[in-house]
Amino acid sequence: MRRVFADTSYWIALVNPRDQIHAKAVSVTQQISPVRILTSEMVLAEVLNSFSDGGPLRHAVGGMVQKLTSNRDVVIVPQTSEQFESALRRYEQAADKSWSLTDCASFQVMEAEKIQAALTHDQHFAQAGFETLLC
């Protein structure tokens, strides 16, 4: 089964029907199925934080993340101290880039798992040499 990494922009687009890439996220998901999706606790924290100011989507995103934890086709990579420190080193080394700490951690997960494609609209993934499925 093909494996892809899912970034923040993908999950936000799926849960928010008004998101500019919602239709594309839904369409690409259907096109690449069956697929095993890897994501990370850091990514999901970003997703939850993006809806923290309230409204109906806050409840929806909380429910989505809960469902992901029991979905056999989704692997959520836990945040470890070692991963955080390694991502921080990469973040510091990439001072010429506008990569976030979560981006750096995501790149490391993708490299460790030998995943080349990301469900993302974030050009930083292409800049780091990965295929972006939502661009």
PLM regions and their residue ranges:
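Short, well-structured N-terminal submotif of metal-dependent ribonuclease cores
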Residues: 1-39, 53-66
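Acidic, PIN/NYN-like endoribonuclease modules and their adjacent C-terminal/linker elements
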Residues: 1-3, 107-135
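Short secondary-structure boundary segments
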Residues: 41, 103, 122-123
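Short amphipathic alpha-helical interaction patches enriched in hydrophobic/aromatic residues
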Residues: 12, 48-52, 72-73, 91, ...
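Short loop->beta-strand "edge-of-pocket" segments that line small-molecule binding or catalytic clefts
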Residues: 36-38, 72-75
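A general alpha-helix detector
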Residues: 10-11, 46-47, 86
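Active-site neighborhoods of divalent-metal-dependent phosphate/nucleic-acid chemistry enzymes
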Residues: 75-117
